[in-house]
Structures are given as structure tokens and as C-alpha cells.
Amino acid sequence: MARAKAVDFFSTKNNSSDSEEEEDKPAVDPRFVLADSDSEGEEEQEDGDEDEEEKGRTSKKKTKDFFELAGKTDDGDDEEEDEEDEEEEEEEKEKKPVKTSSTKAKTKPMTKEEIEKHNKKIAKTGVVYFSRIPPLMDPGKLRMLLQRFGIVDRIYLVPEDPKAQAVRIRHGGNRALAYTEGWAEFTKKRYAKTCASTLNGNTIGGKKGSQHYDDIMNAKYLPKFKWSDLSEQLAQETHNRQARLRTEISQATRENQTYIQSLEKSKAAERRRQRQEEEGGETEEKPAKKVHRDFYQGKTHSARAKEGKKELDGSVGSILGSVM
């Protein structure tokens, strides 16, 4: 009996401790308790999400590799450019920006290394020529269109002739400024090559509601052509235009001067005639002098005339001889 009581005592104690632990635990609503099937479904969803993420990563890698292969060219220059770009990026990371105390930073002359780097950057650039610019397209829209092929540095578009624009507006055309041709500079040659090969002879595309959806671009990559060549060409054209304007202006001034001189002479002659009329009355018009010209006939000299003269002299001499 004593043993049974002891066992009951310890069992009650354990039961009481279990009940106390259950009381300490917070009450949980059975509606929010997940069943075993729900937990298994969540685990399956997590596994599926992980698989999808891995697939997305692999697809991104594949697309990245595809675009890298599409952007690469067969030339060895592009590979060298990539290596040089990586070296330049590492050098820029190593360099730290220098803080200037003064607000106005003094411009320092470039060193030989900086000049060499600048020349290397210029040698990597590529220029694309556009023989036609779609209507209502400005440099900003063209830059947005070309940025999908690579980094665009500079863009220059030739505006329409003001006279042609006035005629177009007079006939009911759009008042917006139009452009006839243009050039775009890319930081890398491969960007320019892919841009020219993709856009040349093809529609711009994009959204069907866009105003340039069906416009066709004419693009050409200019090998061994740099932006400095374009600036020199434009400067030469402006110089020739100014020289032509100077010659036209000088010719117009000469014509005006001759017209003014002849006008002054005619006015002076008119004033002189009026003064003579006031002083001596009406001036009688003097008859114009007749010009007498004498014309003298030149003597003819020919072999036939000389032969006839000799025959005449011989016949006259024979007659005189017979008479004498």
C-alpha cells in the first residue's frame, strides 16, 4: 500500500507538472494550425520556387551569353578593347577622388599618360551615319533608340533648310523642326557595327501605337572615321559658306556703288540743264555734225594681172617697131 501511494504521489506530481507546462503555453487557435498535408504542400512550393529561380538564372546566363556572342565580331580589335576596358576600370577603382578646397578648380595641363589614354579612347570609338531622319524625331528620341545597342557619346543632326521649312509650313505641313541627316558616335566600334547592321533597311518597331513604328532607317557604319573628321568637315563647309557669302556681298556692294555713281551723274546733268534753262532761256538743240568718211580702194596684186601686163607691153612694142 505504501508503494502504491508513493507511485500515485509521483504520478500526480508528474501530471501536475505537465498540466502546469500546458497552462504556461499560449493558447493556439486550431484554425491557424497547419495540417501535415499543408506543410508538405508548402515544402513542395518552396522546392518549385527554388527550381524556377535556378531555371531563371540559367536562362539569364543563356541570354547573356547570346547577347555577348551577338555583340562580338570576328575582328581582334574588339577583344583587345575589352581587355583594355577592364584594365581601365581597375585603374579607376584604385584611384580615389581628390577633394578640392577651393570652389574654382584650376585647370591643369594634361600629362603624356592622360593624352595617351584620351587618344586610346578616341581610337576605340565608332561613328554611324544616318542618311534619313524620320519626321518628328529629335536628338533625344534618337539617343533613346540607339542606347539599346551600346553607350552613345555624341549625336549631331543637320536641321532642315529654313526656306524648305517655310514652304512645308505654307502647304499645311507640320511646324516642328525636321532634320535631314545625322551622325552618332558610340564609345565602342562593335556597338556602332551592331547598330548599323540592325537598323539599316529595317523598321524601327517598338509599340504599335508609337509614331515611329513603321519608319525605316538608313544607317551605315563609317570605318576609320572619327568625330574630329566630322568637325573638320563641318568647319570647312561653314568656311566655304562664309566665303561665298562674302563674295556675294562684295559683288552686291560694287553693283550698288556703280548704280549710285551713275545716279549721281544723271542728277548732276539734270541740275546743269535746269540751270542753263533758267539763265539763257530755252536752249536750242544743235544739229549733229555729219561725219564724212573717205574709203580708198587698194590695188590688187596677182600673178594673172602681171602676165596680162607683160603681154600688153610686148604687143605695143612690136607695133611701135614696125611703125618706126
Swiss-Prot record:
Sorted alphabetically, the Gene Ontology cellular component annotations on this record are: nucleolus; small-subunit processome
Q: Where in the cell is it found?
A: Nucleus, Nucleolus
What InterPro entries does this protein's entry cite? ABT1/Esf2, ABT1/ESF2_RRM, Nucleotide-bd_a/b_plait_sf, RBD_domain_sf
Recorded superkingdom: Eukaryota
Where is the major localization of this protein? nucleus
Q: Does the keyword rRNA processing apply?
A: yes
Domain (RRM) ranges: 126-216
Q: Which GO terms describe its biological process?
A: endonucleolytic cleavage in 5'-ETS of tricistronic rRNA transcript (SSU-rRNA, 5.8S rRNA, LSU-rRNA); endonucleolytic cleavage in ITS1 to separate SSU-rRNA from 5.8S rRNA and LSU-rRNA from tricistronic rRNA transcript (SSU-rRNA, 5.8S rRNA, LSU-rRNA); endonucleolytic cleavage to generate mature 5'-end of SSU-rRNA from (SSU-rRNA, 5.8S rRNA, LSU-rRNA); small-subunit processome assembly
* Chain residue ranges for the region called Disordered: 1-116, 248-324
Summary of the function given for this chain in its UniProt record: Involved in the small subunit (SSU) processome assembly and function, and in the 18S rRNA synthesis. Required for the early cleavages at sites A0, A1 and A2.
Q: Could you identify this protein by its name?
A: Pre-rRNA-processing protein ESF2
